[in-house]
Amino acid sequence: MVQQAESSEAESNLPRDALDTEEGEFMACSPVALDESDPDWCKTASGHIKRPMNAFMVWSKIERRKIMEQSPDMHNAEISKRLGKRWKMLKDSEKIPFIREAERLRLKHMADYPDYKYRPRKKPKTDPAAKPSAGQSPDKSAAGAKAAKGPGKKCAKLKAPAGKAGAGKAAQPGDCGAGKAAKCVFLDDDDEEDDEDDELQLRPKPDADDDDDEPAHSHLLPPPAQQQPPQLLRRYSVAKVPASPTLSSAAESPEGASLYDEVRAGGRLYYSFKNITKQQPPPAPPALSPASSRCVSTSSSSGSSSGSGAEDADDLMFDLSLNFSQGAHSACEQPLGAGAAGNLSLSLVDKDLDSFSEGSLGSHFEFPDYCTPELSEMIAGDWLEANFSDLVFTY
């Protein structure tokens, strides 16, 4: 509407002969001028009703015809680019006649096609990967198909050995295509021997942090006489131990036939050791938390400083029972002395330690390097019965 008001003001300022010449050009190029009596002046051959031209279309139609007469070899896209730049450079007073003609065509369009509604064509969404272009050779398309199937084949190779081990075993979905640091982990642990072979075959080179952790705890391995079979030791190097087991998990976890159970926490797979009998020395833990390492140093220093073997065994048993019952953090903060030992009887400590070894709670507070012969005999003996009621504390 503002443009119409400006057009009326501009018409009064423009000379009349100029308006007559412009109107003559509009009428010459306008579809209405060709055949005003034709009701289908804005329809295509297929019956589609075209949109009414705006001011730019009216102007560009005239200018395009002039350019095509001067240079017929110029490309249509180049003509449109030049016309767009020239239209932006025009003054508002120069655009007014074309705006007026566009308004007249719009009103004519509304009168001839009252039920018209603009419905833009919906372009079909074509997938470029699904349909190769017509100009593309079949060799290139076949190569592209092979490249697309490459990652799928790699995943199938990784999953093939896992399918042999058992139906319940499968690789994690994020392992395929994750890079060299990907770890193939099993979800179930029904068959230990098959799991061990498959895991050692499928597991790529471990991360840098795993390599750094293993040499640091190599001194905690038991002597050759007490070492376990090489298969178990290989599985321990692969497994991860949870940082701090609790008493509730000890009471809830049933004692199964497998040596260790899998615990999934925070999206990462861990292993907790199970069914460690009293006659077998406990395995070396692959990873220790900072709090547990402080407890190791405290218990080792107290055990080495005492003179007699019986005192070493008593101190170590008290340290282990205190760490197990109250947690790593509280045990390291409390002073380990004879005054605190008076509150706990030796039989209760022995029962706690014995039930802890039989209950297979998966704790990492087990130090085979610091076990004295007296303590090993006490642990190996069957003179106490394990009772879980000793582990229950009422407040």
Curated annotation (Swiss-Prot):
| GO cellular component terms attached to this protein's record | nucleoplasm; nucleus; plasma membrane
User: What are the protein's UniProt keywords?
Assistant: Activator, Developmental protein, Differentiation, DNA-binding, Neurogenesis, Nucleus, Transcription, Transcription regulation
Q: Where is the composition biased (Acidic residues)?
A: 187-199
Disordered: annotated segments: 1-22, 114-258, 276-312
| Main location group | nucleus
The biological process GO terms on file are: brain development; camera-type eye morphogenesis; closure of optic fissure; cornea development in camera-type eye; embryonic digestive tract morphogenesis; embryonic skeletal system morphogenesis; eyelid development in camera-type eye; glial cell development
Q: Single GO molecular-function term?
A: DNA-binding transcription factor activity
Entry-linked Pfam families = HMG_box
Biased segments, Polar residues type: 1-11
What is the role of the protein in this entry? Transcription factor that acts as a transcriptional activator. Binds cooperatively with POU3F2/BRN2 or POU3F1/OCT6 to gene promoters, which enhances transcriptional activation. Acts as a transcriptional activator of TEAD2 by binding to its gene promoter and first intron. Plays a redundant role with SOX4 and SOX12 in cell survival of developing tissues such as the neural tube, branchial arches and somites, thereby contributing to organogenesis.
The identity of this protein, by name, is Transcription factor SOX-11
Which species is this record about?
A: Rattus norvegicus
